[in-house]
Amino acid sequence: MKDVQNERDYRGIYLRKVGIKNIHWPIKIITKSGEYQSTVANIDISVDLREDLRGTHMSRFVEVLNGIDFLHPENLGKILQEVREKLKADSSHIKITFPYFIFKKTPVSQIASPNMIECVIEAELSKKLYMIIGVKVPIHTLCPCSKEISEYGAHNQRAIAEIYIKSKKLIWFEDLVEIAERSASAPIYSLLKRPDEKYITETAYNNPKFVEDVVRDIVSELEKEPKISWYRVEVTSFESIHNHNAFACVEKGWIKK
C-alpha cells in the first residue's frame, strides 16, 4: 500500500512535536514499597518531524504503549528510545498524567483509607534525557489573619499543592506528598471519625498558614536536596469565605526584578 506519510514535503518547515494526545491507557506503577499499582493514565506522546517528511506514523505510538508492562521514571528512557527508533526521529516526548492512591491511617482511630493524588511524568529524549515528575496534593490551610482578628474560629479550606521537580536521583511521589502535607496547616484524609476530625481541626487551628507560607515551606525542604536541579511549586487555596481562590507560586531560576 502507498505510504502517504513518507511522501516528500517541500515547504521546508520543521515540526517540533507531532503525535497523539489525550489517549487513556491502563498502566501499572511501581510504588515506593516495591509493589505495583494499576491505574489509568492520560498520555500525550510525540516526536519531531523533519522538514522533508509529510507526516509521521501515528499507529506506531500506540504500538509502543501496547508493549509497556509497567511504568517507572527510570524506564522512560527506554520507552522514548523505542519511540524515536520506530518513528526514525531525532527527539521523542511523553507526558503521562494519572491518579495515584496512597493509603494513610487516620491520626487517632488509625483506620487506613486511600487518598488520591494526581501525578505527572513528563520526559523528552534528544541528545540527553530530560524528565520532570510532579504531584498535585490536596491539603488543608487555615488563615493566620482570620485567626488573629477573630475572637474565636478562623476560616479554613482545602487547597492543592503542586510540586514539579527535575532531579539527578529518583525522588518518589510519596516523598513529594509528604513534603506537601508537612508544609500545610494539616493533611487531608478520605475518612475521618469524630476523634480524627477533632484532631485535624485543632491541628490546623494551631498551625495557620497562608498559601505563601506553604510554598516557602515546601521550597525550604526541596532546597535541602542537592540532587534537585529545578522545581516549580504552586499552592492554590479554595477560599471558603471569598468568591475567589488564593495562590502563590515560585520556580527555581526565576530572577527577582
From Swiss-Prot:
| Gene3D superfamilies found in the cross-reference section | Urate Oxidase
Catalytic activity from the UniProt record: GTP + H2O = 7,8-dihydroneopterin 3'-triphosphate + formate + H(+)
* Ranges in a coiled coil: none
Q: InterPro entries given for it?
A: GTP_cyclohydrolase_FolE2, GTP_cyclohydrolase_FolE2/MptA
Keyword Lyase assigned to the entry: answer is no
* UniProt xrefs under Pfam families: GCHY-1
In its UniProt record, a GO molecular function of this protein is: GTP cyclohydrolase I activity
Q: Could you say which enzyme class this protein belongs to?
A: hydrolase
Site (May be catalytically important) residue list: 143
What keywords would UniProt list here? Answer: Hydrolase
So, what pathway does this thing act in?
Cofactor biosynthesis; 7,8-dihydroneopterin triphosphate biosynthesis; 7,8-dihydroneopterin triphosphate from GTP: step 1/1
The leader peptide range reads none
| A GO biological-process term | tetrahydrofolate biosynthetic process
According to its UniProt record, the EC number is 3.5.4.16
Q: State the function annotated in the UniProt record.
A: Converts GTP to 7,8-dihydroneopterin triphosphate.
By sequence similarity, the record places it as follows:
Belongs to the GTP cyclohydrolase IV family.
Q: What is the recorded name of this protein?
A: GTP cyclohydrolase FolE2
Q: Which organism is it from?
A: Dictyoglomus turgidum (strain DSM 6724 / Z-1310)
Which gene is the coding source of this polypeptide chain?
folE2
